Amino acid sequence: MTTQRLVHMANQVAGFFSSYSEGEAIDGTFTHLRSFWDPRMRREIEAHLAKTGGAGLTPIALAAVKRLAEKDTAAQKSA
């Protein structure tokens, strides 16, 4: 799956939650990505974040991907 497709998908998820408060939208998007995206998809979107700063992601999707990257990094360090 291409990075551009993953960006589009993350933005779609964030769009679903856009009617919620900002915090709830970020939480919902993060939870969806963490629960339903394959680890390879998560690694790819995290690599996109590291490489480009999250180019193309909406603010809600960007915040959720940043949180995802932080949680995955913390989990790797504690393992």
Can you name each region flagged by the protein language model?
Residues 1-31, 35-79:
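Intrinsically disordered, low-complexity, basic-enriched segments
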